[in-house]
Design a protein with these regions (language model features):
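Bacterial N-terminal signal peptides
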Residues: 9-18
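Electrostatic cytochrome c docking/interface patches
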Residues: 24-45, 58-61, 114-141
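The feature marks the first
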Residues: 28-84
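The canonical Cys-X-X-Cys-His
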Residues: 41, 48-54, 108, 144-153, ...
Length: 218
């Protein structure tokens, strides 16, 4: 059963990863996000540093996510979604509105992607071990395949740039829990094809805590 679900997840992951290359061009209006200028992006992202840190590591892990090493395409898409109202957050919706050009957003996104990839502090807790199993094997009885299929080994991502499946290994636990709960409740609706919402709805509160605990330590 685990093998069947994992194989299905791998096939779906490859399909959506291929789709993401085309989607990135559409999201950016035909512009190649990866060609942004990280040096210019550092200056343009000054306001971002107050929450996400100069190095892309959150100044308050209970509130703000890490951006260090995150895919530029994913950052670009999320900021656009905040601008368009497809994703809601009081702070980010306001901040996103201050980025007035796609070129500036591209430079900012590439700046954060250029940083050393986010890294957490490993924990040997029973909860983290449960989360590791969910991440790798999924929850077969609930029809949930392993997160590794789309998010890569240890949650560090798959592909050179990916606008759909973010780096989540080393992300803050509070942010991961909130996003999974928001997807589960329907508060967040900008995931591709509703895929993550469907998964989150099948996870128990404890399973959400477990997978977030594991990923926060990667």
């Amino acid at each position: 059963m685990i093998k069947r679900i994992t194989s299905f997840g791998a096939i779906l992951g490859m399909f959506l990863l291929s789709y993401s290359v085309q989607a990135e061009q559409t999201i950016a209006g035909g512009m190649d996000v990866s060609e942004g200028d990280p040096k210019a992006g550092k200056a343009k992202s000054e306001l971002c540093h107050g929450c996400h840190g100069v190095d892309g590591m959150s100044i308050d892990p209970t509130t703000f996510p890490n951006l260090a090493g995150q895919y530029a395409g994913y950052i670009f898409k999320q900021v656009q979604d905040f601008q368009l109202g497809n994703r809601q957050d009081d702070t980010m919706s306001a901040m996103a509105g201050m980025v007035t050009s796609r070129e500036d957003l591209r430079d900012i996104a590439v700046y954060f992607q250029s940083q050393k990839k986010m890294k957490g502090k490993p924990t040997d807790s029973a909860l983290a071990k449960q989360g590791a199993k969910i991440f790798k094997d999924g929850v077969p009885k609930a029809g949930v395949y392993g997160c590794i299929n789309c998010h890569g080994k240890n949650g560090k991502g798959k592909g050179p740039n990916n606008s759909l499946f973010p780096v989540i290994g080393g992300q803050t636990k509070a942010y991961l829990v909130k996003q999974l709960n928001d997807l589960k409740s329907g508060k967040r609706k900008n995931d591709p094809a509703g895929m993550m919402a469907a998964i989150a709805k099948k996870l128990s509160d404890k399973e959400i805590q477990a997978v977030a605990e594991y990923l926060a330590g990667q």
